[in-house]
Amino acid sequence: MKTLLLTLLVVTIVCLDLGYTLECHNQQSSQAPTTTGCSGGETNCYKKGWRDHRGYRIERGCGCPSVKKGIEINCCTTDRCNN
């Protein structure tokens, strides 16, 4: 019985991957690359781009936000995939 419970515990930990935090780039436009650990079980990184009076702007971070028309967005699900 103890072996069965131990096996179930190990399988649960492996399947849930407890303690895993997605890592996303979070630098803006042409800044040097930086990363951040996402919180709250976030499973996406994003890269958002648009043009304004300063030129083409880029924003990166955790999540996959909704955007207005004219703003490009790319969402992805692996570590540092939004560079």
From Swiss-Prot:
SUPFAM superfamilies in alphabetical order: Snake toxin-like
The secretion signal range is 1-21
Assign the protein's first listed, main location to one coarse class.
secreted
**What tissue specificity does the UniProt entry give?**
Expressed by the venom gland.
Its localization reads: Secreted
Which positions form S-S bridges?
Answer: C24-C45, C38-C62, C64-C75, C76-C81
| Family, similarity comment | Belongs to the three-finger toxin family. Short-chain subfamily. Type I alpha-neurotoxin sub-subfamily.
- Per its record, how is this protein called by name? Alpha-neurotoxin NTX-4
Protein species of origin: Naja sputatrix (Malayan spitting cobra)
